[in-house]
């Protein structure tokens, strides 16, 4: 769902930005 996509994007951003 949309929330799942947002969660994935948020996780990637957290990994890229320490």
From Swiss-Prot:
GO CC list: extracellular region
Known function: Has activity against Gram-positive bacteria and S.cerevisiae. Has non-hemolytic activity.
A single BP term in Gene Ontology: killing of cells of another organism
Family: Belongs to the ponericin-G family.
Chief site of localization: secreted
Residues with Proline amide modification: 18
Subcellular location: Secreted
UniProt keyword annotations, A-Z: Amidation, Antibiotic, Antimicrobial, Fungicide, Secreted
UniProt superkingdom: Eukaryota
Tissue: Expressed by the venom gland.
The protein, known as: M-poneritoxin-Ng3f
């Amino acid at each position: 769902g949309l929330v799942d996509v947002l969660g994935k994007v948020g996780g990637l951003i957290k990994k890229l930005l320490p």
